[in-house]
Design a protein with these regions (language model features):
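Phosphate-binding glycine-rich loops and their immediate beta-loop-alpha structural context
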Residues: 1-60
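Short glycine-/acidic-enriched loop or helix-start segments at secondary-structure transitions
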Residues: 4-6, 69-71, 118, 206
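Generic structural signal for well-ordered, non-membrane alpha-helical segments
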Residues: 10-18, 42-45, 65, 69, ...
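Short, ordered loop/turn segments at secondary-structure junctions
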Residues: 37-40, 63-64, 88-95
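Short, glycine/charged-enriched secondary-structure capping and boundary segments
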Residues: 7-10, 48, 72-76, 122-123
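Flexible glycine/proline-rich
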Residues: 75-218
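Glycine-rich beta-strand-to-loop/alpha-helix junction loops that act as flexible
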Residues: 57-72
Length: 218
């Protein structure tokens, strides 16, 4: 991974997740700290975790799936980690996991920037709301969709979308044509996520669908 300050390194993926999470947490009222980037070995990650034992919440980004270099959970297992849930049937964000590291809540986010963003909005927002004793809530509105949607598969789908007004000045939702989790620019432009339940049937154009609103301008 390449850091944003070293963006001239064209052969590397820019490491944007830490900056996104830092700002996202601060906007929610938390106080975020960016720990050093761990190398792809258990010892390096364990040393960093030792520095985080006075935090209220620890978040990792990347290394949450089961590949050879995904060593986060293996490192945690050596440090008395209690896994509470993992591998969520959702898109994007399947590799997410959550548990307790010596009683400190630990949220493991996927490394893909779009997956990190979607999972932060859905999961991290609620965690921070609970920390502050706020009512856990989501801003969900029913809107007509301006295109048909195919039958969904076994995963809950969060479709990145924009919200526009029709000729009657009513809000309607328009999904982006590209939903690949590599589309960071489209995630940045998203105003909401159409929520599709697992195995949901095909939806006709004009049908009202639940939309998780993420823009303050709607």
């Amino acid at each position: 991974m390449g850091e944003i300050q070293n963006s001239k390194n064209n052969d590397k993926i820019i490491s944007s997740n830490g900056i996104f999470l830092f700002n996202f947490i601060n906007q929610l009222g938390g106080e975020a700290f960016i720990l050093p980037t761990a190398k792809d070995d258990i010892k390096s990650l364990t040393n960093i975790l030792d520095e985080a034992n006075d935090l209220d919440l620890i978040i990792s980004s990347g290394g949450a799936s089961v590949g050879d270099y995904d060593i986060v959970q293996r490192a945690l297992e050596k440090n008395n980690f209690e896994l509470l849930f993992s591998r969520i049937a959702m898109r994007p964000g399947k590799p997410l996991f959550f548990g307790l590291l010596e009683k400190i809540p630990f949220l493991g986010l996927p490394g893909n920037p779009v997956s990190t963003g979607v999972c932060s909005i859905i999961f991290l927002t609620k965690i921070i709301q609970k920390f502050f004793g706020r009512q856990v809530s989501e801003n969900i509105a029913m809107m007509r969709v301006n295109c048909s949607l195919d039958k969904n598969d076994h995963r809950k789908d969060f479709i990145r979308s924009k919200v526009i007004k029709d000729i009657n000045n009513d809000y309607i939702v328009e999904p982006f044509s590209k939903q690949d989790s590599s589309q960071i620019s489209l995630f940045a432009k998203a105003q909401g996520f159409i929520i599709r339940e697992p195995h949901e049937n095909k939806i006709k154009k004009g049908t009202k669908v639940p939309v998780l609103l993420i823009s303050e301008n709607i």
